[in-house]
């Protein structure tokens, strides 16, 4: 079972992930204006010297800025997490995201591309066109990441997700696993399950969804005094437990 851990922003954290045997080690770039960071470059270089793969999420959609990121860091995987559908269906903006991903793929054929496919939270899977979205992006993707998109009580998915307006993820909530399993079953590329996965639920998720791999971010982060996850601070013990439980599922 492949494991993927996100918000690894320093070489020291990357070294721990490598020691744990994490296959995909992910970093996040928050904005295009400060996209070239020496600490992140050192992190990617640390991963490059191991058997693990580096993955990067740019939280922006400017083609030139994304090219700067790829040229500077040379990651193994570029991860797109743009928001492109809601409960009404596939949004018109999806065409721009398909075009952007195709342009990046054409310019960097050696670069693996991961595409986040939004899945509503548990019990609301029918309100998002997750399977249709996967069919659209499969020809230009090497991996899918199934991540949670919050659908409100009125069954409307909104654009302002916790990861930032226009992007999917960072909810800390499990997705609808029945929908996720359907995406796995129809897909011809590896599918990684994300969305609220923790040491306590990862084995159940694996048995239910049967993904190629599992991803954790918020639920393996350190906690504040209110037991809320702290962004960009990993809890190494929770991460170790997550990896061990995923492998023994």
Cite the ranges covered by each PLM segment.
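A C-terminal functional module that forms or caps the active site or interfaces directly
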Residues: 192-210, 221-224
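Conserved, mostly hydrophobic/aromatic
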Residues: 17, 78, 144, 176, ...
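A generic "structured core" feature
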Residues: 145, 153, 191, 212, ...
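Conserved anion-binding
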Residues: 26-33, 48-188
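N-terminal basic/disordered segments at the start of proteins
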Residues: 2-13
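Glycine-rich beta-strand-to-loop/alpha-helix junction loops that act as flexible
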Residues: 57, 81, 192-197, 214-219
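Short amphipathic alpha-helices and their capping/turn segments at secondary-structure boundaries
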Residues: 12-19, 67, 128-140, 202-209
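C-terminal helical cap(s) of enzyme catalytic domains, especially alpha/beta-barrels
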Residues: 40-47, 88-104, 156-165, 169, ...
């Amino acid at each position: 079972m492949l494991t993927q851990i996100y918000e690894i922003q320093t070489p020291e954290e990357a070294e721990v992930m490598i020691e744990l045997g994490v296959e995909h080690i992910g970093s996040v770039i928050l904005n295009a204006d400060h996209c070239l960071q020496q600490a992140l470059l050192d992190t990617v270089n640390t991963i490059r010297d191991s058997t693990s793969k580096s993955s990067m999420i740019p939280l922006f959609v400017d083609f030139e800025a994304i090219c700067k990121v790829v040229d500077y860091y040379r990651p193994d995987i570029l991860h797109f997490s743009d928001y492109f559908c809601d409960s009404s269906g596939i949004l018109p903006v999806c065409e721009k995201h398909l075009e952007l991903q195709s342009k990046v793929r054409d310019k960097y054929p050696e670069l693996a591309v991961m595409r986040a496919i939004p899945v509503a939270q548990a019990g609301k899977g029918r309100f998002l066109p997750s399977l249709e979205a996967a069919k659209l992006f499969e020809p230009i993707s090497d991996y899918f990441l199934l991540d949670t998109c919050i659908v409100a009580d009125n069954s409307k998915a909104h654009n302002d997700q916790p990861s930032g307006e226009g992007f999917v993820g960072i909810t800390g909530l499990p997705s609808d696993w029945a929908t996720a399993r359907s995406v796995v079953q129809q897909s011809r590329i590896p599918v990684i399950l994300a969305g609220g996965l923790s040491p306590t639920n990862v084995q159940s998720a694996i048995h239910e969804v049967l993904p190629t791999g599992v991803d954790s971010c918020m639920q393996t982060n350190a906690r504040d005094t209110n037991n809320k996850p702290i962004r960009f601070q990993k809890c190494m013990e929770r991460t170790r437990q997550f990896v061990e439980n995923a492998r023994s599922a």
